[in-house]
């Protein structure tokens, strides 16, 4: 049984909380959010360092505001935890590079929450495009500005989905 911690209990953190409860072989061992006012069925820590010292964990989901991802991830890596980090992975490329190097150095698995790849409509489109040559891609987003992304802005928060989908559907890297 993998013991998971969930760090950040905002909109995305609550989504991960619900999802993790239904994953076989996963046990939610602890939650961490200094501003959480809600009741959960699991222990909630207000301090990440205290949680990491007190709990015997295997992995963590980081669903804090993006500006806090790097610090939380580095602390978790020091404890040897594998990570799922909500996107965008960091506020800038330099911080993401630091996390990548630390994960490699410690042999830690890190995944970024690119969930759109698993959308049934995207899976159907990927299958449809399987033997086709893609010449041009145009993506349009029609949705209101979500308040939860004010720390990094709409391009950094939502465009990462679009860029990931272009890579996924085309099977090519963007240079």
Where are the regions a protein language model picked out?
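Beta-loop-alpha module in the N-terminal Rossmann-like domain of NAD(P)-dependent dehydrogenases
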Residues: 16, 43-102
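Conserved acidic residues
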Residues: 29, 42, 58, 135
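A contiguous active-site-proximal alpha/beta segment in oxidoreductase catalytic domains
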Residues: 90-149
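N-terminal Rossmann-like dinucleotide-binding module
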Residues: 1-41
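Acidic-histidine catalytic/liganding microenvironments
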Residues: 23, 54-55, 119
């Amino acid at each position: 049984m993998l013991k998971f911690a969930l760090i950040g209990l905002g909109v995305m953190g609550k989504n991960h909380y619900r999802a993790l409860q239904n994953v076989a072989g996963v046990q939610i061992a602890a939650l961490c959010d200094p501003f959480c006012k809600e009741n959960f069925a699991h222990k909630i820590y207000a301090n990440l360092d205290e949680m990491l010292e007190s709990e015997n964990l295997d992995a963590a989901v980081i669903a804090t505001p993006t500006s806090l991802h790097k610090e939380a991830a580095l602390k978790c890596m020091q404890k040897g935890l594998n990570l799922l980090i909500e996107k965008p992975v960091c506020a800038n490329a330099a911080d993401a590079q630091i996390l990548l190097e630390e994960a490699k150095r410690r042999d830690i698995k890190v995944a970024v929450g690119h969930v759109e790849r698993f959308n049934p409509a995207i899976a159907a489109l990927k299958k449809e495009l399987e033997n086709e040559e893609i010449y041009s891609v145009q993506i349009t987003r029609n949705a209101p500005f979500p308040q939860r992304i004010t720390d990094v802005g709409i391009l950094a928060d939502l465009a990462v989905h679009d860029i990931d989908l272009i890579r996924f559907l085309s099977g090519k890297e963007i240079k």
